[in-house]
A protein has these predicted regions:
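Interaction-mediating elements
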Residues: 1-129
Length: 129
């Protein structure tokens, strides 16, 4: 169950945002073997002065189409993560023209005791999930 936060600059259409959401969910679902209805995505749009995104000296040419995917998730297999990174970038580029240099991904692992889906309960810990 990853929680996917997606940060981007303001200016995209609702349709493009929905495509980004659908593509990223489909890729995560396949590569991380998610259960049905295991979809938690939050989009935040920023003014240009609210995000400074450099390239760590890698020579990337960032544009106003930059997207940051930050996932909080149970630990994932290294090979699954590599496939997720590669496929997400490929799908975004092929389907909506986002440059691979404009996609940054970060996955932060956490445990089952770090989640409550509602009612103040730890559903992973009390057997409901």
């Amino acid at each position: 169950m990853p929680l996917m936060r997606i940060d981007m600059f303001k200016g995209r259409s609702k349709e493009e945002i929905n495509e980004i959401l659908d593509i990223s969910y489909t890729v995560a679902s396949k590569e991380f073997h998610l259960l049905p209805r295991d979809r938690y995505q939050i989009v935040t749009q920023h003014d240009p002065e609210e995000m400074i995104i450099e390239d760590v000296g890698l020579g990337f040419k960032r544009t106003d189409k930059f997207i940051m995917f930050s996932l909080t998730s149970s630990p994932r297999d290294v090979e699954d993560k590599k496939r997720f990174y590669s496929r997400l970038v490929k799908e975004l580029h092929e389907k909506i023209g986002i440059s691979p240099e404009d996609v940054m991904i970060n996955i932060t692992p956490n445990g089952k005791d770090d989640w409550s889906f509602g009612n103040g309960e730890a559903q992973f810990m009390n057997g409901k999930l």
